[in-house]
Design a protein with these regions (language model features):
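Surface-exposed amphipathic alpha-helical tracts and adjacent flexible/coil segments at the periphery
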Residues: 1-181
Length: 181
């Protein structure tokens, strides 16, 4: 937030995110040698603490914040319902906990966090510092694996896999080394 504010005078905490995390940067050392070129060095993966909700409750946490800045309604709806479902399962078997609110949430879909926009997930410094907190190759959502390219022919390709594709779906290709193409 300080970085954003210093560059643009805009505060992401006040709804004015300039999305510097979406831009490519190069990293140059003190001797002027380029270490990294054109990577998304500020593109953090999404923090996902779903696996640790019970530990958070046991530690006294009583409210959660999801990433909602510049996210669309489907993201907020899906991720909120996903956490709600996990919390309700814990509350159902842990009578020492109770809801802080009187209302209840309803939804007509099965919430799946991985189906919402994300750059991959990370527990981000949960118990230790991990090396997988960033998504250097792209600031975009990678979606879910749908299959493997089996044949390239001119401007077309054949995919072998189990996932159904629909009109409007975007595709990202990775080569054998895992590089995005």
């Amino acid at each position: 937030t300080l970085f954003r504010s210093a560059l643009s005078g805009r505060s992401a905490n006040r709804g004015e995110c300039a999305q510097y995390c979406r831009l490519p940067y190069s990293l140059i050392d003190a001797d002027g040698k380029e270490i990294v070129s054109g990577k998304h060095l500020l593109s953090l993966k999404d923090m996902n603490r779903g696996e640790y909700l019970e530990e958070l409750l046991d530690a006294g946490v009583s409210s959660l914040k999801i990433e909602g800045r510049l996210k669309d309604v489907s993201y907020v709806k899906n991720v909120t319902a996903w956490y709600r479902k996990k919390l309700d399962a814990i509350l159902a078997r842990r009578p020492e906990y109770r809801r802080a609110s009187a209302g209840h949430s309803t939804y007509t879909f099965e919430p799946v966090a991985e189906k919402s926009f994300n750059r991959g997930f990370t527990p981000f410094l949960w118990k230790e510092r991990t090396k997988d907190i960033t998504s250097f190759d792209t600031p975009k959502s990678l979606g879910e694996p749908v299959g493997t390219v089996k044949e390239l022919k001119g401007n077309s390709f054949t995919i072998a896999g189990l996932k159904q594709l629909n009109n409007g779906d975007g595709l990202t290709f990775f080569n054998e080394k895992g590089d995005r193409k």
